């Protein structure tokens, strides 16, 4: 598995992952043109995770297993947004690897104070993954997304730099200024 910056030629694979039918109620989906515009914007960073192709195919070929988009790279508030993260096949470790890479980039490379995301409230599996990385529940955006004539609520979650640091240094307790129940 290898994580690297996405290239324009990766966009068709990114679009294909976004348009997996099972993801329809969990993530947004852009056109190739929208991704290319976002990729050209220096306030965004795209990452892909490449996995070894196995089976009958050549072993030196890699396939794009997932992607992540960071937004707010130049935020004066040092608040970076995980706009999107998705993998082709769940439960193979690619999503967690992408999330860890995105967190590392946000906090260690871009010196973020806050790393945040929104997730469909009904996406319990994703919410549990984020909670396992100490993301805190910040609130909701009620009925913020309209899909197929039905409104969906988004949960807002975030991780602060001191919480990220305490994860990296076992035994160090993050100081919080607000109770989270």
Predicted regions span which residues?
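Short hydrophobic/aromatic beta-strand or adjacent loop that forms the aromatic wall/cage
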Residues: 44, 152-156
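Acetyl-CoA-dependent GNAT
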Residues: 5-11, 15-90, 96-99, 105-110, ...
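Conserved active-site alpha-helix within GNAT-family acetyltransferase domains
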Residues: 96, 122-139
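Extreme N-terminal starter segment of soluble prokaryotic enzymes
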Residues: 1-2
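Conserved beta-strand-loop-alpha-helix junction that forms the acyl-donor binding cleft
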Residues: 88, 117-127, 144-150
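Conserved GNAT acetyl-CoA-binding A-motif
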Residues: 108-118
């Amino acid at each position: 598995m290898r994580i690297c910056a996405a290239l324009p030629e990766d966009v068709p694979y990114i679009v294909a992952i976004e348009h997996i039918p099972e993801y329809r109620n969990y993530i947004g989906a852009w056109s190739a043109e929208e991704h290319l515009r976002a990729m050209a914007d220096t306030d965004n960073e795209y990452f892909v995770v490449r996995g070894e192709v196995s089976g009958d195919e050549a072993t030196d070929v890699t396939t794009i297993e997932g992607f992540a988009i960071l937004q707010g790279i130049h935020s004066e508030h040092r608040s970076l947004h995980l706009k999107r993260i998705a993998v082709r096949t769940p439960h193979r470790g690619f999503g967690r690897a992408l999330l860890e890479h995105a967190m590392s980039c946000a906090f260690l490379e871009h010196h973020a104070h806050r790393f945040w995301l929104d997730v469909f409230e009904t996406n319990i599996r994703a919410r549990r993954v984020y909670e396992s990385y100490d993301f805190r529940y910040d609130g909701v955006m009620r009925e913020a997304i309209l899909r197929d004539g039905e409104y969906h609520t988004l949960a807002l979650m975030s991780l602060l730099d001191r919480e990220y640091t305490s994860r990296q240094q076992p035994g160090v307790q993050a100081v919080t200024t607000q109770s989270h129940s």
